[in-house]
Amino acid sequence: MEKNTVLLQDTEAFMHGELDNVTVQQNCIVLDLVQGGYVPYGCYTSAPIPMPLFDALRVSWNAASPEDTAVEAQVRVMVDGNWTTWNSFGKWSPSLHREGPPYQARGPVQRWPDRLQLDSKYATAVQLRIYLYSKNEKVSPAVMLLGASVRMVDVIPARGRLVNERLHLSLIHISEPTRLL
């Protein structure tokens, strides 16, 4: 059985991604500290993650977000060998009104408040991104986990599936009708 969930949740996993104004410390992604203060924003982007063929995805994250900080999770998927645009699941913080973004459709991608769904297409990889924001240079949000679960699809090959190796037919004898003169 193929794995349909990926979780990035420790220093080793996070270090495979791209760090932009963020660093990894104590198994968490945090904003960079420059001259005694945290930078106002930063971004972590995972390496591309191959997945079994899928048509829907849910993003998960765990973060500590003190007052005046927020995080924003985003995802993109590979469809027909090309990456879709990034899809945001909104900014989240205890100090913000919590709600997912409204439904949006772009090409084959439908982004619902809690999931990404593909319309008549399938994806083969996922890439995760999370922005960290702070209005206070003394505090930073901390991301402990970033993950995704996909709904795998089973596609019938173009040539079809074999039902049985052999087609079992019983012999039937058909006689010709007799002609009357």
Q: Where are the predicted features?
A:
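Single conserved hydrophobic/aromatic residue that forms the stacking wall/gate
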Residues: 172-181
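Beta-strand-rich ligand- or partner-binding modules
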Residues: 1-168
